[in-house]
Amino acid sequence: MFDLEYQLKNLPDKPGVYLMKNNLGEIIYVGKAKILKNRVRQYFQKSQKHSEKVKAMVKNIEEFEYIITDSEIEALILECNLIKKYRPKYNILLKDDKHYPFIKVTLAEDFPRVISTRKVTKDGSKYFGPYVDGSSVKDIIELIKKTFPIRTCKKNIVEGAKAIRPCLNYQIGLCKAPCAQYIKKSEYREIIDDVIKLLSGKHLDIVENFKLNMEKAAGNLEFEKAAMLRDKINIIEKIGEKQKIILNNFDNEDYISLYSDGKDTCFQVFFLRNGKIVGREHFIIEDTFDTNSSTLISNFLKEFYGGTAYIPKTIYVPNIEDEVLLEQWLTLKKESKSTIKIPIKGEKKNILDLVEKNAKTTLENFKLKYLQEKALYDNVLKDLKNILRLQEEPIRIEAFDISNIQGFDSVGSMVVFEKGRAKPSDYRRFKINTVKGADDYKSMKEILTRRFQHGLSEIKSIQDRKLEFSSGKFSVFPDLILMDGGKGQINIALEVLNTFNINIPVCGMVKDNKHRTRGLIYNGEEIIINKYGSVMKFITRVQDEVHRFAISYHRSLRGKNSFHSLLDDIPNIGEKRKKDLLFNFKSIDNIKKATYEELLSISSMDKKSAESILEFFK
């Protein structure tokens, strides 16, 4: 048994990391300390300085562990790693550990490419970003490919190497074919220099040059060439408009601020690269209560930069805790100097104020939307209770569906809605184990049996250990079950529930002959719900979601198991090469007819794999 008083007395006088646990043994908080003895004891001392969140956490602490480190910076690194590993309830956690996309120009290559990446390394390449919107990176790269004749293949092309036959991109004017040695390295680099200028925001120079060439072409009556240059000018201007210059310096900087309303906090991040805003992002952290802003920002920085691929040269914040220590940690991660600054006045302070205003607006809009949705969902659940004559509003709803094609790879899905909102963390997928062929009823019986068997086992385990009730994977039962089907599916569900002596109302979601949600079946009767507009929309959403979830799982299994072709029998041809070959050649017959050079034009192919194909079809 854990003796709290004894453990507190024997805490070491050293730096380290502490892990707080609840009565289930779950890690609910991870922290670091310069002196473990002082920091951990503070939690258990009565103090008005404790925030509401800390007080709530302390009530749930059953025991703690600690790990001694050689220094405070080592403790900080370990803390970040453990938070990422355990995702403790009372730490600041960002919902998505984002690695933002960058545009990478591979300058270490003789003939560089322009690609998207989420990993920044010291490899001689030039990186532009991060971009918050991944689709904008894709759009920009596609626009660059249309404007500048640069290669898109992954071949290792070196100036002076043996020439190979160029691909289709050369034929249609999208590439200068360095693979065929049709362009010198120096000439190709001039094109890449223009790409870098464009990505650096210096697009006006390129536009001016293109305009001169366009006018010259028009003067020579080369109207087709002039029109092509005009289109390229429009594309370049479109890329240039995506980024607005707001500073005259050219540093890479992040501006981070926050706004708290007493309960929740919104963090806002502005990414400035080369004096331009390239993106912004916000994160809403609930239940921060009266935690001071310097602590919040310190914790946010650890979580945010612990999971990002890129750390800027300078980070501006309104205030912060552990500034020197965090700078050391950021510099270690970046492998070059990174500085945290608190601007007092001037344009940097003005930008930070703007970031805070955006955080305030974002939080207010989030709350407004939340309240509007809550009112809507409250009414939906109230109407659903009345329509079905339930004793209570169905706070937790679980829906089930089966998916298969001609009896292969049958799968089941369970989606969960709580208080009217989808709860993806509780979604579950089931691969059918006991049923052969296409039998939806037996398949449904299997997944429902597994779902409630697991739930009862979890509940028994919690009761046997005399623990507080805690939601496991299946231990929280629904207030209402929705089946994607009619009376047959309902009867299967009721049969399973009766087996376990569980009493939960079960409805069937039925569709019309156009496959649209028509109504509900409950207690053997069909209930028309189209006069309840919001209920109809909600049931349609649930039905679509459970179907989508089942289909997505089925497709993933089908993709792994059901496709076999002649290519699977060829040595040195794996999944990646098989997909690339079929994508480019469209059929096995075309692959059979392909020449050695045509096979090598596929980015994932090498000499050995091309020779294997030629040998196989010989």
From Swiss-Prot:
Residues 13-92 form the GIY-YIG domain. Pfam families: GIY-YIG (PF01541), HHH_2 (PF12826), UvrC_RNaseH (PF22920), UvrC_RNaseH_dom (PF08459). Coiled coil: none annotated. GO terms for cellular component: cytoplasm; excinuclease repair complex. Residues 204-239 form the UVR domain. PROSITE patterns: GIY_YIG, UVR, UVRC. InterPro entries: DisA/LigA_HHH, GIY-YIG_endonuc, GIY-YIG_endonuc_sf, GIY-YIG_UvrC_Cho, RuvA_2-like, UVR_dom, UVR_dom_sf, UvrABC_protein_C. SMART domains: GIYc (SM00465). It comes from the Bacteria. Keywords: Cytoplasm, DNA damage, DNA excision, DNA repair, Excision nuclease, SOS response. One of its GO terms (biological process) is SOS response. The keyword Cytoplasm applies. It is found in: Cytoplasm. CDD domains: GIY-YIG_UvrC_Cho. The keyword Cytoplasm applies. GO terms for molecular function: DNA binding; excinuclease ABC activity. HAMAP family: UvrC (MF_00203). PANTHER family: UVRABC SYSTEM PROTEIN C, UVRC/OXIDOREDUCTASE. Belongs to the UvrC family. NCBIfam families: PRK00558.1-5, uvrC. The UvrABC repair system catalyzes the recognition and processing of DNA lesions. UvrC both incises the 5' and 3' sides of the lesion. The N-terminal half is responsible for the 3' incision and the C-terminal half is responsible for the 5' incision. Interacts with UvrB in an incision complex. This is UvrABC system protein C.
